[in-house]
Amino acid sequence: MFPEHARIENRFEWISYSVSDEAVAVETQGGNLNAEKVRIALEHALALWGVAAPVAFRPAGPDEEPLIRIRFTREGASALNLGNTSGHVDRTPAGPYGAASIRINCDNDLFVDRFFESDRHQTQPGPYDLVAILAHEVGHALGIEHPPTDPATGSESEGGIMSDSVGNAVLRQLLPYDVREVQARHGTIRVAETVGADLAATGRLIDPAGEVSLQVAGRELVLSGAMGSSALLDVLVPARGRVVNAIRLAFTLVTRNVLVNRVTVFDGIVPVQELAVSARAADNDGIAGKRFDLRLGLLRRPRAASDMLVRLQVFFTRAGGQPESDFGVLQLHDVAVETLPLPIEVAREFEPS
């Protein structure tokens, strides 16, 4: 079943973590966050690093000392720091070594669903992306520093999740600097193959609200809708029996009034992970729209018992009341799963004791 090159075993570095005081994040954000959103943000942030390196995060057991402690706090002042990390975890032949403590400053305004949460304090900096903040601090816990500064300009030489600069944009993908640094410290993940979906055969609209239509365009799908409408778009990927590391999505928001808010992944009908994508074109993206090529890591890396169902939550809504078209268009180019090169007999590595 597995090709010969797929019989190279990834040596995963199991990193235990604990999370405390999530209620602080909920209570400080004026209704914008809830416990589910905080969980989604944390799982998304942890899974980002596993896309590039063989690191695997798991909750610490009841009597286990976690390697990474994450705590949501109030620091007494906003915008002074978004988070801080002390200590880090190294990869060693005997397993991960070290410890790190992360604090997330909830006195700042934070968001998960960028375009559905109110800007509570328009006269102060923010709001800030909770997924990016968590991913940044986890990067420090893995031993990664900020990008170096160019002496000539005083600016960082590269951008990335690990950038020290703070903005209120959505950033939920590793950039080249992040990938190089995590692979230098924790190794490079070995991928077996990428298995794509037959979009034309498996694409389905679920629970459309309002005027929404789905059309086949060659091997791709085109989803369009009137303003105020929404739908779930389901696609099946033939992944049965494979260990899935990440989901790959490629789509173009042809018009600015389209928002892909969440992506939910199922093993058949069993939920695997929900990811907050918050993908939307911006004012400066031009008349051709904006293309997104996303690589969404899965925290638990399931061995699929069935085909993987990938569900996109799509809204057709104007951005900030802009005088845009009365309909929006999304073109879906590709949905695929990235599988790991593990034969059946070593897949048990994904079930730590």
Features from the language model and the residues they span:
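Zinc-dependent metalloendopeptidases
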Residues: 1-190
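Glycan-recognition and processing domains
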Residues: 188-228, 336, 340-352
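Short beta-strands within extracellular/lumenal beta-sheet-rich domains
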Residues: 220-242
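A short beta-strand element within beta-rich, extracytoplasmic domains
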Residues: 242-254
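Short, surface-exposed beta-strand/strand-loop-strand elements in extracellular ectodomains
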Residues: 257-270
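Extracellular carbohydrate recognition and processing domains
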Residues: 272-301
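Extracellular Ig-like/FN3 beta-sandwich strand-entry sites
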Residues: 305-309
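Exposed low-complexity, polar/acidic, P/S/T/G-rich flexible segments that act as propeptides
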Residues: 311-353
